[in-house]
Amino acid sequence: MPKKVFQQEDVEQKITENFEPKQEFEQDELDIEMDCSQFETTMDRQNTDIPFQHMVRPKVTMWQKLLMATICLFSCGILAQSVQWLVDSWRDNQWIAFVFAMVSLFLVLLGLGAIIKEWRRLVQLKKRLILQEKSREIRSKSAVNLTEVSSEGKELCLKIASLMGIDDKSPQLIAWQEQVHEAYTEQEILRLFSQNVLIPFDRVAKKLISKNAVESALIVAVSPLAIVDMFFIAWRNIRLINQLAKLYGIELGYVSRLRLLRMVFVNMAFAGAADVIQDLGLEWLSQDITAKLSARVAQGIGVGILTARLGIKAMEFCRPIAVAPEEKLRLSHIQTELLGTLKTTLFSANKVKEKVR
């Protein structure tokens, strides 16, 4: 390699070329751009229920209105035809036709009564959703807007107590009314109502969810037939939703039960498996029982988690006041009980079998 000779002037020239002149900025000319990608991802995870709310309460289209009007006209026509058939049979002394007319009229009235009853139950479920939205609006108000005393929060709580069938002389309701002060804001009134009146219902709901999750996990872990597990879990989940709805004062019919199931499953689909992992954390990965548990027990744990998640979402929808972040029941709360019950039941059974052998 040939030798290179550098001059002192060349080195100084290169050093001076690397420096740039100083720049000064005024305060008004500064335009700071923040990287909001992290905030956007966080908000996207927090707002997974926003599109769900539009699916729960969609806008009624013109075709749906025409369909409802057609069904109403068709029902009125059937009722009028049955009455006309009954009158004609009586006038013409056609007794056999008269009996058939009476039976048909009875069936029509029975069907109309069932439709009206289902409609009332759907209206009741819609009222519950409206109450939840009002509670969210009250909680989202800023403290500046709550300086003036307002009775909206108290009226909302009394309406909720009436819809849930809570007696006016209930100790919890009386204790809440004694704690309410005129200077309290609507947010504080809702918080007191939730702590004094709804917390006992929440405790019962959490016990029901934990019990059903553990029982479902045990049945799947023990049962050798997959089809039996499938029908059993479906029956247990529907039964759990009915129990939670009855606990919070909602009378579910066939259509309203399907509507509630749709709400719960759509919300679970929006949340996705990432939310399940976030709730549980990575504690299970650090535990050493994965090497000891069989595939059947792992299936039982998975079914128990899904049952608990279904119950939690059903509880959130049946609860008249939207669940606050500090009141929310998470899957991690059921984790210890689920694992403890499975280990105690299954491992103790295996030890007994080994002793018998």
From Swiss-Prot:
Transmembrane residue ranges: 67-87, 96-116, 213-233
GO cellular component, as recorded: plasma membrane
Pfam families registered for this protein in UniProt: DUF697
Protein's cellular compartments: Cell inner membrane
Xref: InterPro entries: DUF697, UPF0283
Coarse class of the protein's main subcellular location: membrane
Keywords: Cell inner membrane, Cell membrane, Membrane, Transmembrane, Transmembrane helix
Source organism superkingdom: Bacteria
Identification of the protein by name: UPF0283 membrane protein HS_0596
Organism listed in the record: Histophilus somni (strain 129Pt) (Haemophilus somnus)
Lineage: Bacteria, Pseudomonadati, Pseudomonadota, Gammaproteobacteria, Pasteurellales
